[in-house]
Amino acid sequence: MFSNIGWGEMMILLVAALVILGPERLPGAVRWTTRSLRQLRDYASGATAQLKEELGPEFDDLRKPLAELNELRGMTPRGLVTKHLLNGDDTVLRDLEKAVPTTADLYGTNSGMPDFPKPKMEKPLARNEHPPIDTDAT
């Protein structure tokens, strides 16, 4: 439920609750919160159990498409191609990866980058010398 709240945030919330409620009312507030969360969880599990009882085997029929949607949500493009176009056989993709050369193969082992000539550095201007003006650029 609180999967994206870290220990630092929990400590800040605890200190804020201590300041706002005070040490006298804090234990009662914690008890009320835990009791409410347990009751909410019981309501949710009771509703799920009641839905299973009323729908019977149809409940499983409802869960199958939802499970398939969840499975598709987590798939990568490669996984989708493998599953639907290649019937789960990804040997074709592995063979294709072996056949296509990588950048390191094309340019040797020097970090995959070709050797480009370094740009020429112009000497600095003399004290009274003006920089060249490009009339086409202005």
From Swiss-Prot:
Superkingdom per UniProt: Bacteria
Bias-annotated ranges (Basic and acidic residues): 117-138
Q: Name one GO molecular function term.
A: protein transmembrane transporter activity
Principal localization? membrane
The Gene Ontology CC terms held by the record are: TAT protein transport complex
Q: Does the keyword Transmembrane helix apply?
A: yes
- Topology in membrane: Single-pass membrane protein
Choose any GO biological process term that the UniProt entry carries and state it: protein transport by the Tat complex
Q: Where are the transmembrane segments?
A: 2-22
Coiled-coil blocks: none
Note the InterPro entries from the entry.
TatA/B/E, TatB
* Residue ranges, annotated region (Disordered): 104-138
User: What subcellular locations does the record give?
Assistant: Cell membrane
Which UniProt keywords are given for this protein, alphabetically ordered?
Answer: Cell membrane, Membrane, Protein transport, Translocation, Transmembrane, Transmembrane helix, Transport
Identify its protein family: Belongs to the TatB family.
Give the function comment from the record: Part of the twin-arginine translocation (Tat) system that transports large folded proteins containing a characteristic twin-arginine motif in their signal peptide across membranes. Together with TatC, TatB is part of a receptor directly interacting with Tat signal peptides. TatB may form an oligomeric binding site that transiently accommodates folded Tat precursor proteins before their translocation.
Subunit arrangement?
The Tat system comprises two distinct complexes: a TatABC complex, containing multiple copies of TatA, TatB and TatC subunits, and a separate TatA complex, containing only TatA subunits. Substrates initially bind to the TatABC complex, which probably triggers association of the separate TatA complex to form the active translocon.
Name by which UniProt lists this protein: Sec-independent protein translocase protein TatB
Q: Which organism is it from?
A: Nocardia farcinica (strain IFM 10152)
Q: Upper lineage ranks?
A: Bacteria, Bacillati, Actinomycetota, Actinomycetes, Mycobacteriales
